Swiss-Prot record:
Superkingdom in the source lineage: Bacteria
Stated name of the protein: ATP synthase subunit beta
EC class name: translocase
Ranges where the record places region Disordered: 478-503
PANTHER family assigned: ATP SYNTHASE, ATP SYNTHASE SUBUNIT BETA, MITOCHONDRIAL
Catalytic activity from the UniProt record: ATP + H2O + 4 H(+)(in) = ADP + phosphate + 5 H(+)(out)
Gene name linked to the record: atpD
Residues binding ATP, per UniProt: G168, G169, A170, G171, V172, G173, K174, T175
Topology relative to the membrane: Peripheral membrane protein
Protein backbone atom coordinates (compact mmCIF):
# COMPACT_ATOMS: atom_id res chain seq x y z
CA UNK A 1 0.00 0.00 0.00
CA UNK A 2 1.15 3.54 -0.71
CA UNK A 3 0.83 6.34 1.85
CA UNK A 4 -2.59 7.43 0.60
CA UNK A 5 -3.99 4.02 1.42
CA UNK A 6 -4.34 2.63 -2.09
CA UNK A 7 -2.38 -0.05 -3.81
CA UNK A 8 0.31 1.40 -6.03
CA UNK A 9 -0.94 -0.56 -9.02
CA UNK A 10 2.50 -2.08 -9.71
CA UNK A 11 2.46 -5.82 -10.43
CA UNK A 12 4.12 -8.08 -7.87
CA UNK A 13 5.41 -11.58 -8.38
CA UNK A 14 2.26 -13.69 -8.06
CA UNK A 15 1.76 -17.42 -7.86
CA UNK A 16 0.62 -19.81 -10.56
CA UNK A 17 -2.49 -21.92 -10.04
CA UNK A 18 -4.73 -24.21 -12.06
CA UNK A 19 -8.44 -24.18 -12.83
CA UNK A 20 -10.33 -26.72 -10.73
CA UNK A 21 -13.95 -25.99 -11.65
CA UNK A 22 -15.85 -23.75 -14.08
CA UNK A 23 -19.50 -22.85 -13.36
CA UNK A 24 -20.46 -20.24 -15.95
CA UNK A 25 -18.78 -16.97 -14.95
CA UNK A 26 -17.53 -18.48 -11.65
CA UNK A 27 -14.13 -20.19 -11.74
CA UNK A 28 -12.45 -22.02 -8.83
CA UNK A 29 -8.64 -22.04 -8.90
CA UNK A 30 -6.14 -23.96 -6.73
CA UNK A 31 -2.78 -22.36 -5.84
CA UNK A 32 0.28 -23.62 -3.96
CA UNK A 33 -0.24 -23.11 -0.19
CA UNK A 34 2.34 -20.31 0.03
CA UNK A 35 1.03 -18.43 -3.04
CA UNK A 36 -2.68 -17.87 -2.26
CA UNK A 37 -3.75 -14.55 -3.90
CA UNK A 38 -5.45 -11.77 -1.95
CA UNK A 39 -9.14 -10.89 -2.24
CA UNK A 40 -9.76 -8.65 -5.32
CA UNK A 41 -6.48 -9.68 -6.97
CA UNK A 42 -6.71 -10.03 -10.75
CA UNK A 43 -5.80 -13.42 -12.23
CA UNK A 44 -5.17 -14.08 -15.92
CA UNK A 45 -5.21 -17.17 -18.09
CA UNK A 46 -5.11 -18.01 -21.79
CA UNK A 47 -8.15 -19.45 -23.56
CA UNK A 48 -8.09 -21.16 -26.96
CA UNK A 49 -11.24 -20.66 -29.05
CA UNK A 50 -12.14 -20.90 -32.74
CA UNK A 51 -11.32 -17.20 -33.04
CA UNK A 52 -7.83 -17.75 -31.62
CA UNK A 53 -6.13 -17.28 -28.27
CA UNK A 54 -7.21 -14.53 -25.89
CA UNK A 55 -6.61 -13.59 -22.26
CA UNK A 56 -9.33 -14.06 -19.64
CA UNK A 57 -9.21 -11.90 -16.50
CA UNK A 58 -10.65 -13.21 -13.22
CA UNK A 59 -11.16 -11.38 -9.93
CA UNK A 60 -10.73 -13.20 -6.61
CA UNK A 61 -13.95 -13.02 -4.57
CA UNK A 62 -13.60 -15.75 -1.93
CA UNK A 63 -10.93 -17.82 -0.21
CA UNK A 64 -12.48 -21.29 -0.02
CA UNK A 65 -9.82 -23.09 1.98
CA UNK A 66 -7.98 -26.21 0.79
CA UNK A 67 -5.70 -23.80 -1.17
CA UNK A 68 -8.59 -22.77 -3.45
CA UNK A 69 -10.01 -19.37 -4.39
CA UNK A 70 -13.33 -18.58 -6.04
CA UNK A 71 -13.20 -15.99 -8.81
CA UNK A 72 -15.59 -14.17 -11.12
CA UNK A 73 -14.76 -13.77 -14.81
CA UNK A 74 -14.72 -10.35 -16.48
CA UNK A 75 -15.56 -11.84 -19.89
CA UNK A 76 -16.95 -15.07 -21.32
CA UNK A 77 -15.48 -18.34 -20.03
CA UNK A 78 -16.23 -20.18 -23.28
CA UNK A 79 -13.29 -22.44 -24.05
CA UNK A 80 -11.94 -22.51 -20.47
CA UNK A 81 -11.08 -26.00 -19.24
CA UNK A 82 -10.01 -27.64 -15.99
CA UNK A 83 -6.27 -27.71 -15.52
CA UNK A 84 -5.58 -24.48 -17.40
CA UNK A 85 -2.72 -22.49 -15.86
CA UNK A 86 -3.74 -19.27 -14.08
CA UNK A 87 -1.32 -16.43 -13.24
CA UNK A 88 -1.83 -14.19 -10.18
CA UNK A 89 -0.97 -10.61 -11.23
CA UNK A 90 -0.35 -9.65 -7.60
CA UNK A 91 -2.65 -6.61 -7.77
CA UNK A 92 -6.32 -5.72 -8.39
CA UNK A 93 -7.63 -4.90 -11.85
CA UNK A 94 -5.80 -1.72 -12.92
CA UNK A 95 -7.00 0.61 -15.68
CA UNK A 96 -5.32 3.39 -17.68
CA UNK A 97 -6.00 6.91 -16.39
CA UNK A 98 -5.19 10.41 -17.54
CA UNK A 99 -5.74 12.43 -20.70
CA UNK A 100 -4.87 9.42 -22.88
CA UNK A 101 -8.34 7.92 -22.20
CA UNK A 102 -10.24 11.02 -23.39
CA UNK A 103 -12.08 10.40 -26.65
CA UNK A 104 -11.82 6.63 -26.18
CA UNK A 105 -14.33 3.85 -25.47
CA UNK A 106 -13.09 1.37 -22.86
CA UNK A 107 -14.33 -1.80 -21.21
CA UNK A 108 -14.18 -2.83 -17.54
CA UNK A 109 -10.47 -3.69 -17.84
CA UNK A 110 -9.62 -0.36 -19.45
CA UNK A 111 -9.09 -2.05 -22.82
CA UNK A 112 -10.24 0.00 -25.85
CA UNK A 113 -13.26 -1.32 -27.77
CA UNK A 114 -13.51 1.48 -30.35
CA UNK A 115 -11.16 -0.18 -32.87
CA UNK A 116 -8.76 2.77 -32.72
CA UNK A 117 -5.76 0.89 -31.41
CA UNK A 118 -4.29 0.77 -27.90
CA UNK A 119 -4.60 3.66 -25.45
CA UNK A 120 -1.57 5.83 -26.16
CA UNK A 121 0.69 7.29 -23.54
CA UNK A 122 -0.44 5.07 -20.66
CA UNK A 123 1.69 6.93 -18.13
CA UNK A 124 -0.19 5.45 -15.20
CA UNK A 125 -2.58 2.68 -14.28
CA UNK A 126 -4.71 2.85 -11.16
CA UNK A 127 -6.36 -0.10 -9.37
CA UNK A 128 -10.16 0.06 -9.42
CA UNK A 129 -10.39 -0.75 -5.70
CA UNK A 130 -9.45 2.42 -3.82
CA UNK A 131 -10.62 3.94 -0.53
CA UNK A 132 -12.94 6.95 -0.46
CA UNK A 133 -11.34 10.36 0.30
CA UNK A 134 -10.68 11.05 3.97
CA UNK A 135 -13.18 13.16 5.88
CA UNK A 136 -10.77 16.09 6.30
CA UNK A 137 -10.14 16.18 2.52
CA UNK A 138 -13.81 16.66 1.58
CA UNK A 139 -15.17 19.96 0.30
CA UNK A 140 -18.36 21.35 1.87
CA UNK A 141 -18.85 24.27 -0.51
CA UNK A 142 -22.45 24.57 -1.76
CA UNK A 143 -22.92 26.05 -5.22
CA UNK A 144 -25.55 25.49 -7.93
CA UNK A 145 -24.63 23.85 -11.22
CA UNK A 146 -26.88 25.08 -14.07
CA UNK A 147 -28.23 22.30 -16.30
CA UNK A 148 -30.31 24.42 -18.70
CA UNK A 149 -33.40 22.27 -17.96
CA UNK A 150 -36.07 24.44 -16.31
CA UNK A 151 -37.72 21.92 -14.01
CA UNK A 152 -34.37 20.72 -12.63
CA UNK A 153 -32.78 24.15 -12.21
CA UNK A 154 -35.88 25.61 -10.52
CA UNK A 155 -37.21 22.81 -8.31
CA UNK A 156 -34.36 20.33 -7.74
CA UNK A 157 -31.15 22.30 -8.41
CA UNK A 158 -27.90 20.42 -8.93
CA UNK A 159 -25.10 20.93 -6.42
CA UNK A 160 -21.66 21.40 -7.97
CA UNK A 161 -19.72 18.37 -6.85
CA UNK A 162 -22.92 16.65 -5.72
CA UNK A 163 -24.85 13.56 -6.76
CA UNK A 164 -28.12 13.62 -8.72
CA UNK A 165 -30.36 10.57 -9.11
CA UNK A 166 -32.81 10.32 -12.01
CA UNK A 167 -35.46 7.87 -10.79
CA UNK A 168 -38.04 6.26 -13.03
CA UNK A 169 -39.62 3.02 -14.21
CA UNK A 170 -39.17 1.47 -17.63
CA UNK A 171 -39.61 3.79 -20.60
CA UNK A 172 -40.28 7.13 -18.87
CA UNK A 173 -37.23 8.96 -20.25
CA UNK A 174 -34.26 8.40 -17.90
CA UNK A 175 -31.70 7.83 -20.65
CA UNK A 176 -33.08 10.67 -22.80
CA UNK A 177 -32.82 13.02 -19.80
CA UNK A 178 -29.27 11.95 -18.92
CA UNK A 179 -28.26 12.27 -22.60
CA UNK A 180 -29.70 15.80 -22.67
CA UNK A 181 -27.78 16.65 -19.50
CA UNK A 182 -24.60 15.38 -21.18
CA UNK A 183 -25.38 17.50 -24.24
CA UNK A 184 -26.22 20.66 -22.27
CA UNK A 185 -23.54 20.54 -19.61
CA UNK A 186 -20.69 19.13 -21.68
CA UNK A 187 -21.29 21.73 -24.41
CA UNK A 188 -21.72 24.67 -22.04
CA UNK A 189 -19.21 23.58 -19.45
CA UNK A 190 -16.43 22.33 -21.77
CA UNK A 191 -14.83 20.34 -18.95
CA UNK A 192 -13.86 16.70 -18.59
CA UNK A 193 -16.70 14.16 -18.63
CA UNK A 194 -16.72 10.45 -17.83
CA UNK A 195 -19.71 8.36 -18.96
CA UNK A 196 -20.15 4.87 -17.54
CA UNK A 197 -22.73 2.55 -19.06
CA UNK A 198 -23.62 -0.20 -16.57
CA UNK A 199 -25.73 -3.04 -17.94
CA UNK A 200 -27.59 -0.93 -20.49
CA UNK A 201 -28.24 -1.43 -24.21
CA UNK A 202 -25.29 -1.48 -26.61
CA UNK A 203 -27.43 0.47 -29.09
CA UNK A 204 -27.71 3.38 -26.65
CA UNK A 205 -23.95 3.45 -26.15
CA UNK A 206 -23.35 3.53 -29.90
CA UNK A 207 -25.89 6.34 -30.34
CA UNK A 208 -24.29 8.35 -27.51
CA UNK A 209 -20.83 7.93 -29.04
CA UNK A 210 -22.12 9.19 -32.40
CA UNK A 211 -23.89 12.19 -30.85
CA UNK A 212 -20.82 13.19 -28.83
CA UNK A 213 -18.57 12.88 -31.87
CA UNK A 214 -20.97 15.00 -33.92
CA UNK A 215 -21.24 17.64 -31.17
CA UNK A 216 -17.46 17.85 -30.83
CA UNK A 217 -17.38 16.96 -27.10
CA UNK A 218 -15.92 13.46 -27.50
CA UNK A 219 -12.37 14.79 -27.18
CA UNK A 220 -13.13 15.79 -23.56
CA UNK A 221 -15.00 12.59 -22.66
CA UNK A 222 -14.06 9.06 -21.62
CA UNK A 223 -16.69 6.38 -22.27
CA UNK A 224 -16.64 3.14 -20.26
CA UNK A 225 -19.12 0.37 -21.01
CA UNK A 226 -20.13 -2.91 -19.39
CA UNK A 227 -23.26 -3.67 -21.37
CA UNK A 228 -26.27 -5.99 -20.97
CA UNK A 229 -24.70 -8.88 -22.87
CA UNK A 230 -21.59 -9.06 -20.66
CA UNK A 231 -21.06 -11.36 -17.65
CA UNK A 232 -22.18 -10.09 -14.23
CA UNK A 233 -18.57 -9.58 -13.12
CA UNK A 234 -17.99 -6.98 -15.84
CA UNK A 235 -21.27 -5.18 -15.09
CA UNK A 236 -20.49 -5.25 -11.36
CA UNK A 237 -17.01 -3.72 -11.71
CA UNK A 238 -17.41 -1.29 -14.62
CA UNK A 239 -18.81 1.38 -12.28
CA UNK A 240 -15.57 1.24 -10.27
CA UNK A 241 -13.56 1.56 -13.49
CA UNK A 242 -15.45 4.75 -14.38
CA UNK A 243 -15.04 6.22 -10.89
CA UNK A 244 -11.30 5.46 -10.89
CA UNK A 245 -10.80 7.35 -14.16
CA UNK A 246 -12.84 10.30 -12.81
CA UNK A 247 -10.84 10.28 -9.55
CA UNK A 248 -7.57 10.73 -11.44
CA UNK A 249 -8.85 13.90 -13.12
CA UNK A 250 -10.07 15.17 -9.74
CA UNK A 251 -7.11 14.24 -7.52
CA UNK A 252 -4.10 14.53 -9.82
CA UNK A 253 -5.17 17.15 -12.37
CA UNK A 254 -7.38 19.10 -9.93
CA UNK A 255 -10.31 19.25 -12.35
CA UNK A 256 -14.08 19.54 -11.87
CA UNK A 257 -15.30 16.33 -13.49
CA UNK A 258 -18.77 15.40 -14.75
CA UNK A 259 -19.58 11.75 -14.08
CA UNK A 260 -22.59 10.16 -15.78
CA UNK A 261 -23.73 6.68 -14.76
CA UNK A 262 -26.50 4.80 -16.57
CA UNK A 263 -27.81 2.73 -14.81
CA UNK A 264 -26.96 2.38 -11.12
CA UNK A 265 -29.74 -0.21 -10.66
CA UNK A 266 -27.85 -2.54 -13.03
CA UNK A 267 -24.85 -2.26 -10.68
CA UNK A 268 -27.03 -3.57 -7.83
CA UNK A 269 -28.52 -6.20 -10.13
CA UNK A 270 -25.08 -7.44 -11.23
CA UNK A 271 -24.00 -7.58 -7.57
CA UNK A 272 -27.08 -9.69 -6.90
CA UNK A 273 -26.05 -12.13 -9.64
CA UNK A 274 -22.47 -12.33 -8.36
CA UNK A 275 -23.70 -12.88 -4.79
CA UNK A 276 -25.97 -15.72 -5.91
CA UNK A 277 -23.14 -17.30 -7.91
CA UNK A 278 -20.95 -17.10 -4.79
CA UNK A 279 -23.60 -19.08 -2.90
CA UNK A 280 -24.48 -16.33 -0.41
CA UNK A 281 -27.86 -16.33 1.30
CA UNK A 282 -30.04 -13.57 -0.21
CA UNK A 283 -31.77 -10.92 1.89
CA UNK A 284 -35.15 -9.26 1.31
CA UNK A 285 -36.65 -9.41 -2.21
CA UNK A 286 -33.72 -11.60 -3.28
CA UNK A 287 -31.01 -8.92 -3.15
CA UNK A 288 -27.52 -9.64 -1.88
CA UNK A 289 -27.01 -9.08 1.88
CA UNK A 290 -24.06 -6.79 1.08
CA UNK A 291 -26.06 -4.36 -1.11
CA UNK A 292 -25.67 -1.39 1.25
CA UNK A 293 -21.93 -1.94 1.67
CA UNK A 294 -21.31 -2.29 -2.08
CA UNK A 295 -23.39 0.78 -2.90
CA UNK A 296 -21.62 2.80 -0.21
CA UNK A 297 -18.16 1.75 -1.45
CA UNK A 298 -19.02 3.11 -4.91
CA UNK A 299 -20.98 6.21 -3.90
CA UNK A 300 -18.55 7.48 -1.25
CA UNK A 301 -15.82 7.73 -3.89
CA UNK A 302 -18.03 9.97 -6.05
CA UNK A 303 -17.49 13.17 -4.09
CA UNK A 304 -15.74 16.54 -4.02
CA UNK A 305 -12.42 17.22 -2.36
CA UNK A 306 -10.33 20.34 -1.82
CA UNK A 307 -8.39 19.41 -4.99
CA UNK A 308 -11.35 19.10 -7.37
CA UNK A 309 -14.90 17.83 -7.71
CA UNK A 310 -16.97 15.07 -9.28
CA UNK A 311 -20.54 16.09 -10.13
CA UNK A 312 -22.46 12.91 -10.89
CA UNK A 313 -25.74 12.21 -12.65
CA UNK A 314 -27.04 8.69 -12.09
CA UNK A 315 -30.01 7.09 -13.83
CA UNK A 316 -31.84 4.78 -11.43
CA UNK A 317 -34.32 2.22 -12.79
CA UNK A 318 -37.24 1.71 -10.40
CA UNK A 319 -38.59 -1.86 -10.76
CA UNK A 320 -42.37 -1.92 -11.24
CA UNK A 321 -42.40 1.81 -10.35
CA UNK A 322 -41.88 0.82 -6.70
CA UNK A 323 -39.58 3.33 -4.95
CA UNK A 324 -39.43 1.11 -1.85
CA UNK A 325 -37.54 -1.59 -3.79
CA UNK A 326 -34.21 -2.12 -1.93
CA UNK A 327 -32.01 -1.16 -4.91
CA UNK A 328 -33.35 2.37 -5.60
CA UNK A 329 -34.06 2.85 -1.89
CA UNK A 330 -30.38 2.21 -1.08
CA UNK A 331 -29.31 4.85 -3.62
CA UNK A 332 -31.55 7.56 -2.08
CA UNK A 333 -29.39 8.05 1.01
CA UNK A 334 -26.32 9.01 -1.04
CA UNK A 335 -27.89 11.72 -3.22
CA UNK A 336 -27.99 15.51 -3.01
CA UNK A 337 -30.81 15.86 -5.55
CA UNK A 338 -33.52 13.41 -6.61
CA UNK A 339 -35.32 13.83 -9.93
CA UNK A 340 -38.43 11.64 -10.00
CA UNK A 341 -39.85 10.76 -13.41
CA UNK A 342 -43.62 10.21 -13.39
CA UNK A 343 -45.43 7.75 -15.64
CA UNK A 344 -48.62 9.80 -15.23
CA UNK A 345 -46.93 12.94 -16.59
CA UNK A 346 -45.29 10.89 -19.35
CA UNK A 347 -48.74 9.66 -20.42
CA UNK A 348 -49.87 13.30 -20.55
CA UNK A 349 -46.92 13.99 -22.93
CA UNK A 350 -45.22 16.35 -20.44
CA UNK A 351 -41.56 16.00 -21.41
CA UNK A 352 -39.36 15.71 -19.42
CA UNK A 353 -41.82 13.84 -17.22
CA UNK A 354 -40.29 15.15 -13.97
CA UNK A 355 -42.66 15.07 -10.98
CA UNK A 356 -42.19 18.55 -9.44
CA UNK A 357 -43.68 17.54 -6.09
CA UNK A 358 -41.74 14.29 -5.60
CA UNK A 359 -38.37 15.70 -6.74
CA UNK A 360 -36.12 17.43 -4.22
CA UNK A 361 -32.70 18.95 -3.60
CA UNK A 362 -30.63 19.65 -0.49
CA UNK A 363 -29.51 23.02 -1.91
CA UNK A 364 -33.01 24.44 -2.55
CA UNK A 365 -32.25 26.87 0.24
CA UNK A 366 -32.23 30.71 0.27
CA UNK A 367 -28.61 30.71 1.47
CA UNK A 368 -27.49 28.80 -1.64
CA UNK A 369 -29.85 29.60 -4.53
CA UNK A 370 -30.99 33.03 -3.31
CA UNK A 371 -34.22 34.31 -1.80
CA UNK A 372 -36.04 34.99 -5.09
CA UNK A 373 -35.30 31.54 -6.55
CA UNK A 374 -36.40 29.86 -3.32
CA UNK A 375 -39.66 31.83 -3.10
CA UNK A 376 -40.59 31.20 -6.74
CA UNK A 377 -39.89 27.46 -6.37
CA UNK A 378 -42.05 27.25 -3.24
CA UNK A 379 -44.90 29.17 -4.91
CA UNK A 380 -44.77 26.85 -7.94
CA UNK A 381 -44.87 23.78 -5.68
CA UNK A 382 -47.68 25.30 -3.61
CA UNK A 383 -49.89 25.90 -6.66
CA UNK A 384 -49.21 22.41 -8.06
CA UNK A 385 -49.89 20.83 -4.64
CA UNK A 386 -53.25 22.61 -4.37
CA UNK A 387 -54.13 21.48 -7.91
CA UNK A 388 -53.33 17.89 -6.92
CA UNK A 389 -55.64 18.19 -3.89
CA UNK A 390 -58.47 19.53 -6.06
CA UNK A 391 -58.26 16.84 -8.75
CA UNK A 392 -60.53 14.40 -6.91
CA UNK A 393 -63.20 17.10 -6.50
CA UNK A 394 -62.89 18.02 -10.18
CA UNK A 395 -63.20 14.35 -11.22
CA UNK A 396 -66.36 13.83 -9.13
CA UNK A 397 -68.20 17.17 -9.26
CA UNK A 398 -66.60 19.00 -12.17
CA UNK A 399 -64.57 22.20 -12.27
CA UNK A 400 -67.69 24.40 -12.14
CA UNK A 401 -68.23 23.43 -8.48
CA UNK A 402 -64.93 25.04 -7.43
CA UNK A 403 -64.67 28.50 -5.92
CA UNK A 404 -63.43 31.31 -8.17
CA UNK A 405 -60.11 31.33 -6.31
CA UNK A 406 -59.62 27.60 -6.88
CA UNK A 407 -60.56 27.93 -10.55
CA UNK A 408 -57.75 30.47 -10.94
CA UNK A 409 -55.32 28.13 -9.16
CA UNK A 410 -56.31 25.19 -11.40
CA UNK A 411 -55.86 27.25 -14.57
CA UNK A 412 -52.51 28.58 -13.37
CA UNK A 413 -51.34 25.10 -12.30
CA UNK A 414 -52.15 23.67 -15.72
CA UNK A 415 -50.07 26.42 -17.32
CA UNK A 416 -47.21 25.76 -14.89
CA UNK A 417 -47.38 22.03 -15.57
CA UNK A 418 -47.03 22.63 -19.30
CA UNK A 419 -44.38 25.32 -18.80
CA UNK A 420 -42.22 22.77 -16.96
CA UNK A 421 -41.98 20.85 -20.25
CA UNK A 422 -39.12 21.71 -22.58
CA UNK A 423 -37.90 20.70 -26.06
CA UNK A 424 -34.65 18.72 -25.90
CA UNK A 425 -31.72 18.95 -28.27
CA UNK A 426 -31.37 15.15 -28.29
CA UNK A 427 -35.08 14.71 -29.15
CA UNK A 428 -35.23 17.17 -32.08
CA UNK A 429 -35.67 14.32 -34.58
CA UNK A 430 -38.79 13.15 -32.70
CA UNK A 431 -40.43 16.48 -31.80
CA UNK A 432 -39.34 18.53 -34.85
CA UNK A 433 -38.75 21.35 -32.35
CA UNK A 434 -35.33 22.95 -31.80
CA UNK A 435 -33.85 22.22 -28.37
CA UNK A 436 -33.72 24.98 -25.74
CA UNK A 437 -31.09 25.73 -23.09
CA UNK A 438 -32.71 28.09 -20.57
CA UNK A 439 -30.45 30.18 -18.35
CA UNK A 440 -31.21 30.13 -14.61
CA UNK A 441 -32.09 33.84 -14.38
CA UNK A 442 -34.57 33.48 -17.25
CA UNK A 443 -36.12 30.39 -15.64
CA UNK A 444 -36.70 32.12 -12.29
CA UNK A 445 -38.06 35.31 -13.89
CA UNK A 446 -40.36 33.40 -16.27
CA UNK A 447 -41.93 31.32 -13.50
CA UNK A 448 -42.29 34.39 -11.27
CA UNK A 449 -44.42 36.04 -13.96
CA UNK A 450 -46.58 32.93 -14.33
CA UNK A 451 -47.23 32.44 -10.58
CA UNK A 452 -48.07 36.15 -10.27
CA UNK A 453 -50.78 35.69 -12.91
CA UNK A 454 -49.30 38.03 -15.51
CA UNK A 455 -50.02 35.53 -18.29
CA UNK A 456 -53.34 34.03 -17.16
CA UNK A 457 -54.91 35.31 -20.39
CA UNK A 458 -52.63 33.21 -22.62
CA UNK A 459 -53.80 29.78 -23.85
CA UNK A 460 -52.39 26.70 -22.10
CA UNK A 461 -50.96 25.40 -25.37
CA UNK A 462 -48.64 28.41 -25.56
CA UNK A 463 -46.77 27.14 -22.47
CA UNK A 464 -46.15 23.64 -23.89
CA UNK A 465 -42.65 22.59 -25.05
CA UNK A 466 -41.07 26.06 -25.03
CA UNK A 467 -38.04 27.70 -23.41
CA UNK A 468 -38.51 30.96 -21.50
CA UNK A 469 -41.47 33.34 -21.25
CA UNK A 470 -40.50 35.10 -24.49
CA UNK A 471 -41.06 31.82 -26.32
CA UNK A 472 -44.49 31.56 -24.65
CA UNK A 473 -45.49 35.03 -25.88
CA UNK A 474 -44.24 34.24 -29.39
CA UNK A 475 -46.13 30.94 -29.49
CA UNK A 476 -49.29 32.67 -28.21
CA UNK A 477 -49.05 35.16 -31.10
CA UNK A 478 -48.65 32.30 -33.57
CA UNK A 479 -51.66 30.47 -32.12
CA UNK A 480 -53.71 33.68 -32.25
CA UNK A 481 -52.71 34.23 -35.88
CA UNK A 482 -53.61 30.66 -36.81
CA UNK A 483 -56.99 31.06 -35.09
CA UNK A 484 -57.73 34.28 -37.01
CA UNK A 485 -56.73 32.63 -40.28
CA UNK A 486 -59.02 29.72 -39.46
CA UNK A 487 -61.95 32.05 -38.75
CA UNK A 488 -61.38 33.94 -42.01
CA UNK A 489 -61.20 30.68 -43.94
CA UNK A 490 -64.43 29.51 -42.29
CA UNK A 491 -66.16 32.79 -43.23
CA UNK A 492 -64.98 32.46 -46.84
CA UNK A 493 -66.26 28.89 -47.00
CA UNK A 494 -69.57 30.00 -45.51
CA UNK A 495 -69.78 32.80 -48.09
CA UNK A 496 -69.02 30.44 -50.97
CA UNK A 497 -71.60 28.00 -49.66
CA UNK A 498 -74.25 30.72 -49.39
CA UNK A 499 -73.42 31.96 -52.90
CA UNK A 500 -73.72 28.44 -54.27
CA UNK A 501 -77.13 27.97 -52.66
CA UNK A 502 -78.31 31.35 -54.02
CA UNK A 503 -77.34 30.40 -57.56
Amino acid sequence: MSQDGRRDGQPREGGVGRVVEVKGPVVDVRFPPDQIPEIYNALTCKIETEEGEHTLTLEVQQLLGDDMVRTVAMSSTDGLRRGVEVQDTGRPIAVPVGEAVLGRVLDVLGEPVDEQGPVEGEADRWPIHRPAPKFEDLSTKAEQFVSGIKVIDLLCPVRRGGKVGLFGGAGVGKTVLITELINNIALQYEGTSVFTGVGERTREGTALYGEMEEAGVLKNTALIFGQMNEPPGARFRVGLTGVTIAEYFRDVLGQDVLFFLDNIFRFAQAGNEVSALMGRMPSEVGYQPTLGTEMGALQERITSTKKGSITSFQAVYVPADDPTDPAPFTVFAHLDSTVELSRSLFEQAIFPAVDPLASSSTILDPDVVGQEHYEVAQEVKGILQRYKELQDIIAILGIDELSEEDKVIVARARRLQRFLSQPFFVAEQFTSLPGKFVELEETVQSFREVVEGKHDDLPEQAFYLVGGIDDVLEKARQLSGEEEEGEEAAKEEAGVGAGGEGS
